[in-house]
């Protein structure tokens, strides 16, 4: 990791925290406000998702019941661990929830792992192709974390309607937790409760990865003789953080769906 000599410290940080943007109004590489697509986030997340699917597909095709290889062992351990976690939290049909949980955990972990790549490596490669800004950590972008949390929210609503029906869900919203006589308060509490879930889910992941990325950038500004030591210490700690954050996002998704699927 090294800083660009032509930039001040503030400019260096700003440069590495800026996205490769596409203005959806006129399809130019400018800031379009709300109608801006962060191409770097899209590219890295899609590539990592495709890599995840490809690796699992290849190993599934080569899976053997005799003596499994190291990759097969690792994936079987991950699948069993996630399935066991889902089984403890979700007591209905796990045919959709377990694969969803596994996908979320692996995909979020891979996107988080990009935070451990040297901060100048990927931006420099894209600079050679004429791209001035490139932010390589998708989960440090709130647009992606909110997109994922909103998708989880849609699944929660779907399970609410699927398990309780429109009438049953309506009764639950109007009567819980304070009974029928306080219906307006019940509705307000329910709206707040449901609205906070995707917001907290998105901000928790974004905040941790944004802070981690910023610290790596600040370490890159230090003298070369201190970068390695501090970088290694923070990398070891951050490896735990990215794993825990992927697990928390997966776990909360399962819990929210489980709560929605419960019949009262």
UniProtKB/Swiss-Prot annotation:
Pfam families for this protein: ATP-synt_A
Transmembrane segment boundaries: 39-59, 97-117, 139-159, 205-225, 239-259
Stored NCBIfam families: ATP_synt_6_or_A, PRK05815.1-1
CDD domains registered for this protein in UniProt: ATP-synt_Fo_a_6
Subcellular compartments: Cell inner membrane
Quaternary organization: F-type ATPases have 2 components, CF(1) - the catalytic core - and CF(0) - the membrane proton channel. CF(1) has five subunits: alpha(3), beta(3), gamma(1), delta(1), epsilon(1). CF(0) has three main subunits: a(1), b(2) and c(9-12). The alpha and beta chains form an alternating ring which encloses part of the gamma chain. CF(1) is attached to CF(0) by a central stalk formed by the gamma and epsilon chains, while a peripheral stalk is formed by the delta and b chains.
Gene: atpB
InterPro entries: ATP_syn_F0_a_bact/chloroplast, ATP_synth_F0_asu, ATP_synth_F0_asu_AS, F0_ATP_A_sf
GO cellular component, as recorded: plasma membrane; proton-transporting ATP synthase complex
Protein name according to UniProt: ATP synthase subunit a
Biological processes per GO annotation: proton motive force-driven plasma membrane ATP synthesis
């Amino acid at each position: 990791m090294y800083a660009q000599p032509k930039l001040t410290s503030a400019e260096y940080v700003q440069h590495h925290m800026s996205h490769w943007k596409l203005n959806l109004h006129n399809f130019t590489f400018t800031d379009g406000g709300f109608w801006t697509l962060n191409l770097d986030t899209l590219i890295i997340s899609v590539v990592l998702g495709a890599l995840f699917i490809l690796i699992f597909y290849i190993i599934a095709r080569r899976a053997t019941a005799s003596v499994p290889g190291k990759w097969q062992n690792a994936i079987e351990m991950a699948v069993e661990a996630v399935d066991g976690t889902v089984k403890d939290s979700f007591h209905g049909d796990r045919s959709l929830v377990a694969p969803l949980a596994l996908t979320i955990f692996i995909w979020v972990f891979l996107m988080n792992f990009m935070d451990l790549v040297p901060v100048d490596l990927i931006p420099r490669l894209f600079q050679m192709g004429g791209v001035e800004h490139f932010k390589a950590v998708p989960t440090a972008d709130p647009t992606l974390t909110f997109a994922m949390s909103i998708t989880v929210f849609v699944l929660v609503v779907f399970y609410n309607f699927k398990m309780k029906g429109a009438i049953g869900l309506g009764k639950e919203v109007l009567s819980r937790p304070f009974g029928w006589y306080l219906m307006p308060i019940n509705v307000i509490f329910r709206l707040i409760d449901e609205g906070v879930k995707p917001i907290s889910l998105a901000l928790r992941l974004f905040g941790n990865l944004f802070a981690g990325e910023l610290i790596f950038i600040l370490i890159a500004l230090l003298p070369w003789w201190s970068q390695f030591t501090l970088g290694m210490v923070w990398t070891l700690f951050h490896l735990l953080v990215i794993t825990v954050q992927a697990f928390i996002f997966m776990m909360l998704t399962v819990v929210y769906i489980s709560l929605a699927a419960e019949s009262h």
